[in-house]
Amino acid sequence: MSVLDEIIDGVRADLAERQARVSLDELKERAARAPQAKDGVAALRGEGVTVICEVKRSSPSKGALAAIADPAALAADYEAGGASVISVLTEERRFGGSLADLEAVRAKVDIPILRKDFIVTSYQLWEARAYGADLALLIVAALDQEALVSLIERAESIGLTPLVEAHDEEEAERAVDAGAKIIGVNARNLKDLKVDRSTFERVAPEIPDHIVKVAESGVRGPHDLIAYANAGADAVLVGESLVTGRDPRAAVADLVAAGAHPALRHGRG
């Protein structure tokens, strides 16, 4: 069994517990009261290369990363540094996240928020909207094509922008065929958790220009952002290096400045 399979087994068990406590109708009522969802595509189509900053306590590959007692304060630092989108991990077992983190961040920041989790049912999409998310992660490797198409359509119908994650050319093609408007290429292999930064360079050419291309994993600083930008990235997602660093606001500002450099924009055409 792969790491991804193990994570999803845990996600399904935790999901069953939440479904027993909170009905879908209750979630829909809460979602109806939530602020109107912000446009994730527009947020990531900014000048130069935009930055998604992640609230992330731990990971399967590294274990505990940071305590993050106040996720909202961290998100506010990200926003102050110039982040375009905040990513909030809500998976509990491997990443130490929660829907409470998502709710707290929503109350603090004005920019769009991505619910980052292992979404396998429409119930989780309703959770995302109910707790204030504007975007939701859908992982191609976790879904068959019928489910992927269905979840993209459901997400968009309730105001969410799907960020569809691929790990190779075949998955990117599936994401394009399913109608994704944002595709994230994750350099981390979910089978063995190793990072290969050349993954984006291989996969990006398979993604049409009208789709926002996000480089995920392996961004340690501006030099990695620039490398991804030169390979065609419209945005990067950064987590570990921010939560383990001393000054997340300054680190984000450095990334944003690199992404906005005129020479970089010119180089990307």
From Swiss-Prot:
Pathway: Amino-acid biosynthesis; L-tryptophan biosynthesis; L-tryptophan from chorismate: step 4/5. One of its GO terms (molecular function) is phosphoribosylanthranilate isomerase activity. It catalyses: 1-(2-carboxyphenylamino)-1-deoxy-D-ribulose 5-phosphate + H(+) = (1S,2R)-1-C-(indol-3-yl)glycerol 3-phosphate + CO2 + H2O. GO terms for biological process: L-tryptophan biosynthetic process. Keywords: Amino-acid biosynthesis, Aromatic amino acid biosynthesis, Decarboxylase, Lyase, Tryptophan biosynthesis. Its EC number is 4.1.1.48. SUPFAM superfamilies: Ribulose-phoshate binding barrel. InterPro entries: Aldolase_TIM (IPR013785), Indole-3-glycerol_P_synth (IPR045186), Indole-3-glycerol_P_synth_dom (IPR013798), Indole-3-GlycerolPSynthase_CS (IPR001468), RibuloseP-bd_barrel (IPR011060). CDD domains: IGPS. Coiled coil: none annotated. Belongs to the TrpC family. This is Indole-3-glycerol phosphate synthase. The gene is trpC.
